[in-house]
């Protein structure tokens, strides 16, 4: 029997307060997160942003117990998925590959090779594809695969996204139904989907399918929920976790909550649609920040649907994804990460960024001036970045 390695891709998260700064550095050093005209700027900017943001982020992690539960939950998901796959007759072993914190992707690949796997299924724990989540993880795995003869020869099947998988939709609808039924008036309870946002340019310029998949997924869940409840509920989709001054997908969660409060919404059922595990965005951002904002805006009852975590129908859905993938053709990492519009993180043609012999000198001077301004603001504690809420 073929030995199957199932690689579960996820973001990762700091498990201790002292891990927050290094975790943020790894996050912002990824060109999929911040796109810059030169790779030489990536690490200095990542150091600067992680230094400036670590204090605020540490406070957030302290409010949920001092660290992220993401690794613990993901490893439990992996164990239960492995158990279920073996019950179905597969010789499967699961591996957790985090992008920005331990256990890193390199560790998962090393363990998989040491265990002598015969083929690989790559399953991102992101239902919806985005450049900055599944895309970044696929490309990191491809980087490790290139030049590694033992890894390169393994047949590989990548699951690009699964936002419309019946098992996922069913599990989400069931958990939402639990909270809707507990509302004062279940038929009028307003279902509020809060998805992690991405910059608008990802969708409009790079061809990222994330927004389309989120919207389609929301419609499928609401249809399934109506079948469970026997009636339709009003619902809203908004996007959270915006960082920086650039425009992200709208409506923003904060603004949508304020509007629902002004409309005298009595029962609000909040659904973390793009998150399959409890972590900082659910436990702190939604449960603390958004709950307070919604209450102040006038929402009477604020309920949050629990994350899928190890909910049995969800684990069954993941197992279905793996078995279906094994029945189909190989899907390469490059194919899984492909976008309709090619994204050039660092253009090979310098003119695409306005560079020529003279402008390159001025770009360097401006970059040094900007970096000096960053450092001055860091030392003084005052400046435009503080005004924009970045620091």
From Swiss-Prot:
It is found in: Cytoplasm. Fe cation binds at residues 196, 281. Its main location: cytoplasm. GO terms for cellular component: cytoplasm. Its EC number is 4.98.1.1. It holds the Pfam family Ferrochelatase. GO terms for molecular function: ferrochelatase activity; metal ion binding. It catalyses: heme b + 2 H(+) = protoporphyrin IX + Fe(2+). InterPro entries: Ferrochelatase, Ferrochelatase_AS, Ferrochelatase_C, Ferrochelatase_N. PANTHER family: FERROCHELATASE, FERROCHELATASE, MITOCHONDRIAL. This is Ferrochelatase. It comes from Parasynechococcus marenigrum (strain WH8102). The gene is hemH.
């Amino acid at each position: 029997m073929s030995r199957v390695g199932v690689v579960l891709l996820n973001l990762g998260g700091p498990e201790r307060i002292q891990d927050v700064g290094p975790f943020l550095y790894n996050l912002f050093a990824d060109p999929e997160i911040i796109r810059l005209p030169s790779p030489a700027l990536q690490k200095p900017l990542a150091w600067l942003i992680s230094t400036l943001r670590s204090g605020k982020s540490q406070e957030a992690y302290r409010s949920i117990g001092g660290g992220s539960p993401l690794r613990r939950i993901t490893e439990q998901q992996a164990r239960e998925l492995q158990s279920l796959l073996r019950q179905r007759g597969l010789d499967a072993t699961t591996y957790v590959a985090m992008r920005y914190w331990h256990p890193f992707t390199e560790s998962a690949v090393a363990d998989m090779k040491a265990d002598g796997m015969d083929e690989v299924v790559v399953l991102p724990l992101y239902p919806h594809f985005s450049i900055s989540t599944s895309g970044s993880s696929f490309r990191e795995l491809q980087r490790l695969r290139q030049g590694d003869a033992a890894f390169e020869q393994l047949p590989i099947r990548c699951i690009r996204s699964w936002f419309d998988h019946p098992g996922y939709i069913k599990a989400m609808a069931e958990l939402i139904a639990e909270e809707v039924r507990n509302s004062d008036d279940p038929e009028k309870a307003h279902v509020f989907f809060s998805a992690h946002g991405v910059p608008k340019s990802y969708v409009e310029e790079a061809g990222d399918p994330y927004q389309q998949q989120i919207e389609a997924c929301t419609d499928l869940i609401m249809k399934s929920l109506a079948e469970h409840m026997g009636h339709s509920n009003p619902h809203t989709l908004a996007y959270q976790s915006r960082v920086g001054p650039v425009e992200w997908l709208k409506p923003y969660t904060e603004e949508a909550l304020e509007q629902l409060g002004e409309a005298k919404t009595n029962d609000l059922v909040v659904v973390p649609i793009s998150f399959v595990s409890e972590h900082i965005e659910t436990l702190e951002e939604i449960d603390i920040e958004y709950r307070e904002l919604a209450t102040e805006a006038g929402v009477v009852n604020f309920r949050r649907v629990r994350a899928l975590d190890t909910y049995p129908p969800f684990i069954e859905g993941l197992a279905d994804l793996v078995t279906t993938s094994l029945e189909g053709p190989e899907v390469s990492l490059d194919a899984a990460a492909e976008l309709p519009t090619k994204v050039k993180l660092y253009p090979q043609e310098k003119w695409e960024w306005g560079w020529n012999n003279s402008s390159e000198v001025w770009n360097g001077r401006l970059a040094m001036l900007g970096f000096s301004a960053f450092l001055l603001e860091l030392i003084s504690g005052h400046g435009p970045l503080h005004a924009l809420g970045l620091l």
